[in-house]
């Protein structure tokens, strides 16, 4: 994500994004750079406009299912244990993301 953000910043400023410029942006804010990831992002974005990237991203987001419908009262009683287990798993997943030393673009 940090590489994409740097790519978009360069593009918005009217510059042609390349590996050197992306590295310079990320290093200016103290982010460690992985050369193979920079190359991978550049090759994946080669020949695409920002508008195409946004359209493609919107299509992918539209495909992500939203929250499911609320269950009926009778069904909730039957699936209470399953819901409690799912809630515990979600809480554990949320807690694992709490400030693990990641920066803004990690």
Curated annotation (Swiss-Prot):
Residues 65-106 are annotated as: Disordered. Phosphorylation is not involved in the interaction of the acidic P proteins with the ribosome, however it is suggested to affect the ribosome activity and to participate in a possible ribosome regulatory mechanism. It is found in: Cytoplasm. It comes from the Eukaryota. One of its GO terms (molecular function) is protein kinase activator activity. There is a cross-link at residues 2, 48 (Glycyl lysine isopeptide (Lys-Gly) (interchain with G-Cter in ubiquitin)). Its main location: cytoplasm. The modification Phosphoserine is found at residues 40, 43, 49, 96. Keywords: Cytoplasm, Isopeptide bond, Phosphoprotein, Ribonucleoprotein, Ribosomal protein, Ubl conjugation. GO terms for biological process: cytoplasmic translation; cytoplasmic translational elongation. Residues 83-100 have a biased composition (Acidic residues). InterPro entries: P1/P2_N_sf (IPR038716), Ribosomal_P1/P2 (IPR027534), Ribosomal_P2 (IPR044076). One of its GO terms (cellular component) is cytosolic large ribosomal subunit. Signal peptide: none annotated. Residues 65-82 have a biased composition (Low complexity). The modification Phosphothreonine is found at residue 16. Belongs to the eukaryotic ribosomal protein P1/P2 family. The 4 small acidic ribosomal P-proteins from yeast can be classified into two couples of similar but not identical sequences. Each couple (P1A/P1B and P2A/P2B) is distinctly related to one of the two acidic ribosomal P-proteins P1/P2 present in multicellular organisms. Component of the ribosome, a large ribonucleoprotein complex responsible for the synthesis of proteins in the cell. The small ribosomal subunit (SSU) binds messenger RNAs (mRNAs) and translates the encoded message by selecting cognate aminoacyl-transfer RNA (tRNA) molecules. The large subunit (LSU) contains the ribosomal catalytic site termed the peptidyl transferase center (PTC), which catalyzes the formation of peptide bonds, thereby polymerizing the amino acids delivered by tRNAs into a polypeptide chain. Component of the large ribosomal subunit (LSU). Mature yeast ribosomes consist of a small (40S) and a large (60S) subunit. The 40S small subunit contains 1 molecule of ribosomal RNA (18S rRNA) and 33 different proteins (encoded by 57 genes). The large 60S subunit contains 3 rRNA molecules (25S, 5.8S and 5S rRNA) and 46 different proteins (encoded by 81 genes). The 5 acidic ribosomal P-proteins form the stalk structure of the 60S subunit. They are organized as a pentameric complex in which uL10/P0 interacts with 2 heterodimers, P1A-P2B and P1B-P2A. This is Large ribosomal subunit protein P2A.
């Amino acid at each position: 994500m940090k590489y994409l953000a740097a790519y978009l910043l360069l593009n918005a400023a009217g510059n042609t994004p390349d590996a050197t410029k992306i590295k310079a942006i990320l290093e200016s804010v103290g982010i460690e750079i992985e050369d193979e990831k920079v190359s991978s992002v550049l090759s994946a974005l080669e020949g695409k406009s920002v508008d195409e990237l946004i359209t493609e991203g919107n299509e992918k987001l539209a495909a992500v299912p939203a929250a499911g419908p609320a269950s009926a009262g009778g069904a909730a009683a039957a699936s209470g244990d399953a819901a409690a287990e799912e809630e515990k798993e979600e809480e554990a997943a949320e807690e694992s993301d709490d400030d693990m030393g990641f920066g803004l673009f990690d």
